[in-house]
A protein has these predicted regions:
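Short Gly/Thr/Asp-enriched flexible loops that form oxyanion-binding sites at enzyme active sites
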Residues: 78-103, 121-122, 281-290
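N-terminal beta-alpha supersecondary unit
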Residues: 2-82, 111, 243
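Conserved phosphate-binding catalytic cores of ATP/NTP-utilizing and phosphoryl-transfer enzymes
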Residues: 1-2, 109-135, 316
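Glycine-rich phosphate-binding loop plus the immediately following alpha-helix
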Residues: 113, 151-194, 218-219, 223-227
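A contiguous, well-structured pocket-lining segment that forms one wall/lid of small-molecule binding clefts
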Residues: 69, 190-271, 281-294, 321-324, ...
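Short beta-strand scaffold segments in enzyme catalytic cores
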Residues: 15-20, 137-139, 145-149
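Glycine-rich phosphate-binding/hydrolytic loop that grips phosphoryl groups
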Residues: 115-117, 301-340
Length: 340
């Protein structure tokens, strides 16, 4: 009998539901919230209200597109955390109610685990390259920057992580400093493609081991821009493409420097990226180039699976379900999760 898993993702500002059958994606529906752009960031209260409005129609549409009924489901995978508590509570509560009504098990998923396993999302009639275990994953998003050793679909070891800000936050803060809007990552990426990445240079951290730090590079940009505007009020408008290209290159240099070191120390040549920042064109180009240079096997998730989506939650939940993992109904969402 086929395992049919419903995945539910509601950790931030996207309500998503997906259905997989024996590891093959049948549907992936996402309802994004546009209201936050007016505030320059996600407003938790508005996000949770939107999830409440979206969760039922999104799940219904995912089931319809998959061609299955709720009674056909084997289990429900849902994001427990990390994320915004109000948003997570909507998805968790819905998963509990559906689990009770259908008398089927729940499987909680760490949101980051979903990003790590995004390369395993299989689609009908679409060729897919899957990394072999163990592999390294550069996990980069608005809330996390980590190098993870993935031993199996359910076993992970964090080799390094940010000690302050995440790289996605650095992109957003840069965009705000330059008056470019939110979310900053895609805006900076687009402008960077028109700029000169060697034009400006910003401070890079000297952090031991495999950990990251991005607070210093943000401060370096802030002071540099402030000083230049004092000399020329039109500095930003004249140089925004070069500023974006140079700042983006600095962040990518920092990310890949530690990833290269991790690959050397572990002697692992299977390398992936995941998380929202893995959609960045500069990062994708550089990691592929490093892969060729260093004889890595590199794997890049499809861009549509880099941002928050339930397909990755469903595939992570499927792996856990096969491993015998079940989640009790008294589970509560958490904004932070200590480990995987």
């Amino acid at each position: 009998m086929a395992d049919i898993i419903l995945g539910i993702e509601s950790s931030c500002d996207d309500t998503s539901a997906a259905v997989i059958r024996d590891g093959v994606l049948l549907s992936n529906v996402i309802a994004s919230q546009q209201v936050h752009k007016d505030f320059g960031g996600v407003v938790p209260e508005l996000a949770s209200r939107a999830h409440e409005q979206n969760i039922v129609p999104v799940v219904s549409e995912a089931l319809r597109k998959a061609g299955v009924e709720a009674k056909d489901l084997t289990a429900i995978a849902f994001t427990r955390g990390p994320g915004l508590l109000g948003s997570l509570l909507v998805g968790t509560s819905f998963a509990k109610a559906l689990s009770l009504s259908l008398d089927i098990p729940m499987v909680m998923v760490n949101h980051l685990q979903g990003h790590i396993l995004a390369n395993f999302i299989r689609q009908p009639d679409v060729p897919v390259r899957e990394p072999s275990f163990p592999y390294l994953c550069l996990l980069v998003s608005g809330g996390n920057s980590q190098i993870v050793k993935v031993k199996s679909p359910v076993e992970y070891e964090i080799l390094g992580q940010t000690i302050d800000d995440a790289v996605g936050e650095a992109f957003d803060k840069c965009s705000k400093m330059l008056g470019l809007g939110y979310p900053g990552g895609p805006i900076i990426d687009a402008l960077a493609q028109k700029g000169a990445p060697e034009r400006f240079h910003f401070a890079k951290p000297n952090i031991p081991g495999l950990d990251y730090s991005f607070s210093g590079v943000k401060t370096s940009l802030l002071y540099f821009v402030r000083d230049q505007i004092a000399l020329d009020p039109d500095f930003l408008e004249k140089n925004k493409e070069d500023l974006c290209a140079s700042f983006q290159k600095t962040l990518i240099d920092i990310l890949l420097g530690k990833l290269i070191r991790a690959a050397k120390e572990t002697r692992i040549r299977e390398v992936t990226i995941g998380g929202g920042v893995s959609a960045n064109s500069g990062l994708r180009e550089r990691i592929e180039a490093e892969g060729i240079k260093r004889h890595w096997n590199t794997y890049l998730p499809e861009r549509k699976f880099t941002t928050d989506n339930a397909a990755m939650i469903a595939i992570a939940g499927w792996f856990q379900y096969k491993a015998g993992v079940r989640t009790p109904l008294d589970v509560a969402p958490v904004s932070r999760m200590a480990d995987f």
